[in-house]
Amino acid sequence: SYMAAGGKAIVVTTYTDQDMTNFKSILDEYGVSVTKGILAETDNGHYYQNPFYLIPEVKSNTYTSDFADSKYVFAPYAQGLTVSENDALSVTQMLVTSENAVVKDDPQNMTSYESEDGDETGQFTLGAKVEKTADDTTSTLFVFSSENLFTDESSQMVGGSNLQLFTRVINDLSEEQSSVSIPVKEYTQESITVPQNQFVFLGLTTVILLPVLLLTAGIVIWVRTVSYTHL
């Protein structure tokens, strides 16, 4: 087959209630298993506004080095991946959740984003590269678990880092040494995405602390004015 002969492929999973037996068997060959449901983050430093809007930890490597320490990646409605490594399989992690992610097997009927009875919890992979070596031949599988990961909308939410990741992966698949991606100029305001904990802090600063500081400054000025008037 193509992969057995040293082929390269990219797979992006999506949530479905159908039994994808053949699809799962392909992933099994590369030590990859996929959770049945969708991941919710309970760590507010790893999601944006909605616990299904994941902002994973970016592992620094060849594919993420341009933005791993300076930008976020936006991965909404992702499934969880578990990737095994052995003598035949070499794994490069790219995107992972916090250790507090929760699998929601039936997201349409769930009652809470928090862990409930029967929910699987832990850290999950959202993106990885798996190299399989057999008979001195190495094949490569890139696997990602959010079908919205490489859309323009998701990439724009984080300043284009999703597109940077996609470009690096495609370069590897096509065996290009480098590629220049020039975004089309659009006269639209770029979205700024921050994790939920930072979003809450900024909100408290704007709604509570800033008015208090302004009120305090006003009182100080008034007291000084009254004191000066009575001199």
Residue ranges and their predicted role:
Residues 8, 224-226:
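Basic side chains
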Residues 178-182, 214:
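Intrinsically disordered or highly flexible coil/loop and linker segments, enriched in small
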Residues 212-224:
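Alpha-helical transmembrane segments
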